[in-house]
UniProtKB/Swiss-Prot annotation:
Its cofactor is pyridoxal 5'-phosphate. Its EC number is 2.3.1.47. Homodimer. Pyridoxal 5'-phosphate binds at residues 114-115, 187, 212-215, 232-235. Substrate binds at residues 27, 34, 139, 344. Pathway: Cofactor biosynthesis; biotin biosynthesis. This is 8-amino-7-oxononanoate synthase. The modification N6-(pyridoxal phosphate)lysine is found at residue 235.
Length: 379
């Protein structure tokens, strides 16, 4: 008698989960409530969080929260439709204009998330017969968009300008169009791409460049501006959503061609209003933006690590189980520093990803550094 489909599906899932358990790679949801500043309650335990991407502490800023409340009261909870039907509410137009101005571009387009932005932009611009050159450590959503595009895709070694130039010299003439993908700040390593130099190579070989600025906006100082500047509203801006800034013709094309924009509901008014308020605070309070990097550098100096380039500092551990054990030991001491394991990072490079916020106190940073030293996790 054949096995009912639901039973075979459950058996498949159970076998896969057993494999993940054996490798220390199973993921679990843990209830976590932010309680003010950099503090949180994690599964009932009070902790200082060093795993939150709210780099400027704006998610709970009174002006940001008030803007979200006002939009909620005026426009309701949801946008009511896709952007091309009824979901393009007035706050989105304001937000897009502010993002474009911040990035020095003519226009911007807000997506449902940063992941959706990368998922939609690349396939809308390149396809079969074209070439994509992507940094090997590019975010998962950059790779997902690359695969959807159907173009020939070649990774270049991380931040290796020589390798990128070699690939362009060898492959560019075979393709109609070429697109280079990189991140301004790499999310798991915290290092920065040589954007100006990449743009120079792009000009020399008639290639376009998309820079993912998800972890840079509002945290690291401006550098060269790419023709395609993508980012998120969920990190330094403390809200939710994604965006692309570009020329007006490119934005107009994406409005019609980016499937992850066309076929999804518009961002809720409250999320857009919160992001807009946060963006205005960043413009008005430049000192706030300098604090996460300063704290990150204080931390790396105390641990003898290479000087931080961003608000993200990796503490490399190696194997997944060891990273999990170190994370648990820190949590027992009152610090939330989540272990990052494959496939998010390459095998053998499991780590603690330490994220710094303007909401952290220097004493909290020093205490975390000392805890890591006490646990033998740093030099």
């Amino acid at each position: 008698m054949p096995v009912p489909p639901t039973l075979s599906l459950d058996a498949f899932a159970a076998a896969k989960l057993a494999g993940l358990d054996a490798a220390g790679l199973r993921r679990r949801l843990v209830p976590t409530a932010r309680t003010g500043g950099a503090r949180a309650e994690r599964d009932g335990r009070a902790v200082v969080s060093f795993s939150c991407n709210d780099y400027l502490g704006l998610a709970t800023h009174p002006e940001v929260v008030a803007a979200a409340h006002a939009a909620l009261d005026r426009y309701g909870a949801g946008s009511g439709g896709s952007r091309l039907v009824t979901g393009s509410h007035p706050i989105l137009a304001e937000l897009e204009a502010a993002l474009a101005a911040r990035k020095g571009h003519e226009a911007a387009l807000v997506f449902g998330s940063g992941y959706l932005a990368n998922l939609g932009v690349t396939p809308a611009l390149v396809g079969a017969g074209d070439l994509i050159l992507i940094d090997e450590l590019g975010h998962s959503c950059m790779w997902a968009g690359t695969r959807l595009a159907g173009a020939r895709a070649l990774p270049f070694r991380h931040n290796d300008l020589g390798h990128l130039e070699d690939l362009l010299a060898r492959e560019r003439a075979r393709a109609r169009r070429a697109l280079i993908l990189t991140e301004r700040v790499f999310s798991m390593d915290g290092d920065r791409a040589p954007v100006a130099e990449i743009l120079g190579l792009a000009r020399a070989f008639d290639a376009w460049t998309l820079v993912d600025d998800a972890h840079g906006l509002g945290v690291v100082g401006p550098d060269a501006t790419a023709p395609l500047e993508m980012g998120t509203l969920s990190k330094a801006l403390g809200s939710y959503g994604g965006y692309l800034c570009a020329s007006r013709p490119v934005i107009d094309l994406l409005t019609s061609r980016a499937r992850s924009f066309v076929y999804t509901t518009g961002l809720p008014p409250a999320s857009a209003a919160a992001a807009l308020a946060a963006l205005r605070l960043i413009e008005a309070e430049p000192a706030r933006a300098a604090r996460p990097l300063a704290l990150a550098r204080r931390f790396t100096a105390r641990l003898g690590l290479p000087e931080a380039q961003s608000a993200v500092v990796p503490v490399l551990v190696g194997e997944a189980e060891a990273a999990l054990a170190l994370s648990r030991a820190l949590e027992a001491r009152g610090f939330l520093v989540v272990a990052i394991r494959p496939p998010t990072v390459p095998p053998g490079t499991a780590r603690l990803r330490v994220a710094f916020s303007a909401a952290h106190e220097e004493a909290e940073v020093d205490a975390l550094a000392q805890a890591l030293l006490d646990l033998g996790a740093a030099a």
